[in-house]
């Protein structure tokens, strides 16, 4: 039998926990990238370890591995669905690199939160036209 691995990303609080709905549109690429970086390993599930609550929350996993991720979890995917997520992740990365090279650092499709500690230096507002 092949060795099975669980990938764990530790977060201080549950605020850092992301799910598949944020991964598919490219808003959270970290967990898919972690799995992709371990192609030579049989990663059966990817979990967040929430330090403050001492809980583990499943983010992604192989649907057939129900001892590691519930089949009801939106992140429980069939092999082909995981491959598609990885393909989409690669496309998002290419798009982000192209934007960076073009000098586009916009935070689309989201807006900067009022509570963001970087909002004073972030380009979260539309460019203002100034008369010179």
For the regions a protein language model found, what residue spans apply to each?
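RecB-family 4Fe-4S metal-dependent nuclease core
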Residues: 1-132
């Amino acid at each position: 039998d092949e060795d099975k691995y669980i990938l764990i990303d530790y977060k201080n609080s549950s605020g850092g926990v992301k799910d598949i709905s944020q991964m598919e549109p490219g808003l959270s690429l970290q967990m898919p990238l972690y799995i992709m970086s371990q192609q030579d390993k049989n990663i059966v599930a990817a979990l967040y370890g929430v330090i403050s609550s001492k809980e583990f929350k499943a983010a992604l996993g192989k649907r057939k591995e129900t001892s590691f991720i519930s089949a009801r979890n939106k992140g429980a995917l069939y092999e082909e669905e995981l491959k598609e997520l990885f393909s989409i992740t690669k496309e998002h990365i290419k798009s982000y690199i192209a934007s960076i090279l073009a000098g586009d650092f916009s935070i689309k499709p989201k807006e900067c939160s009022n509570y963001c500690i970087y909002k004073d230096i972030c380009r979260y507002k539309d460019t203002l036209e100034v008369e010179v």
